[in-house]
């Protein structure tokens, strides 16, 4: 039995993690975010009602679940307050269900200003960040000048630390980026206005999780973004600023790494990517447009159109290695309905003619990579909302089986629609 289950993306994000976390939390006592910030966009559809969460864990809609934001998350007080209000206006008692680590770094206005100024300065080489201050906040954390939730317990000392760090960053904004300085007093006043709310939710997350483990409670760890955006293992520099792989669970929450029981990789039935960076199977033809339209591939956070392409099992195998995946959840299978043929990338042809079955590391090494495809028959029947494996067309079953063969990982869950009911759980991670 797996008490501590990790749910993470195996591609470039947007795989459909939020729905699956929400579905599986029916049995969980805690749901923990361990990396990223409000650059995530996790969409839940319950009884036709849509909820998009950016910072708060996807378990917040369940009254029997405690949601936790771990130390690996960079926390924007403004974004958290906005999200809390939206949920509370719908009658969800967020403050009764949400806890925070005091070690969460804070994202403040100057981080957002730095993010946008830096992207503007990069010009054509822009990373394609969400412009929410995520990277600069992680940068401050690593440079050991960042302010954390725990600093809010001592308001006088917080004000002094804030003044010092803002002098540093405003000098950078004005003199290097030729941008406007950020107003110190406004940042201080805005942060102090919500300080007591934030500190009232603080808990020792590592200790809480260890006690939960000893009791045998079920805990779900909710990843954001995707494996191929990992700061260390992704398509650097076109990556996010945190560890999106399973290793981030231990560092971002304080759970001992040996206590992770099951790692569920969310796998979209085709590939998408937002922003710049390598994407060997990207389609620029009518099939690419079909996938975008049928899959409604527009970012929940930015509204940007996602780039679309065939499923890349070479890249997915890298995710299998990095995360020691226990099983997959295949999402958006129904988007492929109606295609005469479907393709799987099974290898890459490098510029020198070599065929390889592992991904390069740095983004520059992906240049000139050509996908080698295996073509399979498509299916005309609808898979939307199918709740039993026997109801799937044979061609869809063949596609599923081939993915399992190419990756060496079983598909334990199949999602056939956005609602939590439109799901087949072939093997429950908490029972694995």
Curated annotation (Swiss-Prot):
GO terms, molecular function: adenylosuccinate synthase activity; GTP binding; magnesium ion binding
UniProt binding sites for substrate: 300-306
Binding positions for IMP per the UniProt entry: 14-17, 39-42, 130, 144, 225, 240, 304
EC number assigned by the record: 6.3.4.4
Pfam families cross-referenced by the UniProt entry: Adenylsucc_synt
Binding site for Mg(2+): 14, 41
S-S bonds: none
Swiss-Prot/TrEMBL keywords: Cytoplasm, GTP-binding, Ligase, Magnesium, Metal-binding, Nucleotide-binding, Purine biosynthesis
Active site: 14 (proton acceptor), 42 (proton donor)
One GO term (biological process): 'de novo' AMP biosynthetic process
Chief site of localization: cytoplasm
Keyword Zinc: no
Subunit details: Homodimer.
Cofactor notes: Binds 1 Mg(2+) ion per subunit.
Homology family: Belongs to the adenylosuccinate synthetase family.
Cofactor names: Mg(2+)
Pathway: Purine metabolism; AMP biosynthesis via de novo pathway; AMP from IMP: step 1/2
Function: Plays an important role in the de novo pathway of purine nucleotide biosynthesis. Catalyzes the first committed step in the biosynthesis of AMP from IMP.
Species per Swiss-Prot/TrEMBL record: Salmonella choleraesuis (strain SC-B67)
GO cellular component: cytoplasm
This protein's name: Adenylosuccinate synthetase
Subcellular localization: Cytoplasm
Catalytic activity: IMP + L-aspartate + GTP = N(6)-(1,2-dicarboxyethyl)-AMP + GDP + phosphate + 2 H(+)
Binding of GTP, residues: 13-19, 41-43, 306, 332-334, 415-417
